[in-house]
Amino acid sequence: MKDDFVIYNETDFYIKPYQDDFNAIFQKIKTLLAITEPLELSLIIVDAQEQLELNQKYRHKDYVADVITFALEEENKIDLFELTGLRSLGDIFICYEKALAQAAEYNHSPRREFAFLFTHGMLHILGYDHQTPADEEKMFNLQRKVLNDLQINRIPIK
């Protein structure tokens, strides 16, 4: 069975230039983590208002987050893998306005920022976090490896 990785764009922002990167990151993370079972994952591009509403409703936070993840595996009572043949990971929401603003703030390309946010979100949804220094080092090293291997580098914009 094949992976079911779907990108939904709920905005007018033109996301097509980033789709190849999202697919490459998805595959690179599977390879690096030796994930062999087929995965199901949704990436949803939203605007600031929708991201704020998601953050308020589900995380009780009153700000626009750059990326929010909703992992199915940690809350699932039934084994969806047995039902579907797919390991259902959940949903990653990226706020395109926040991504563009952060790219400008950090003086690198929107491509790099979208790739970073998707990588960060996918690692979170797979159980990685940065709550302790050791966990942070592990997660951030993996993020750097994914982006470096795909040559999506932090090149300053002039």
Curated annotation (Swiss-Prot):
One of its GO terms (molecular function) is zinc ion binding. Zn(2+) binds at H120, H124, H130. One of its GO terms (biological process) is rRNA processing. It is found in: Cytoplasm. It is an enzyme of class 3 (hydrolase). Its EC number is 3.1.-.-. Binds 1 zinc ion. Its cofactor is Zn(2+). Its main location: cytoplasm. The keyword rRNA processing applies. One of its GO terms (cellular component) is cytoplasm. Keywords: Cytoplasm, Endonuclease, Hydrolase, Metal-binding, Nuclease, Ribosome biogenesis, rRNA processing, Zinc. It comes from the Bacteria. Transmembrane segments: none annotated. PANTHER family: ENDORIBONUCLEASE YBEY, CHLOROPLASTIC. Single strand-specific metallo-endoribonuclease involved in late-stage 70S ribosome quality control and in maturation of the 3' terminus of the 16S rRNA. Belongs to the endoribonuclease YbeY family. This is Endoribonuclease YbeY.
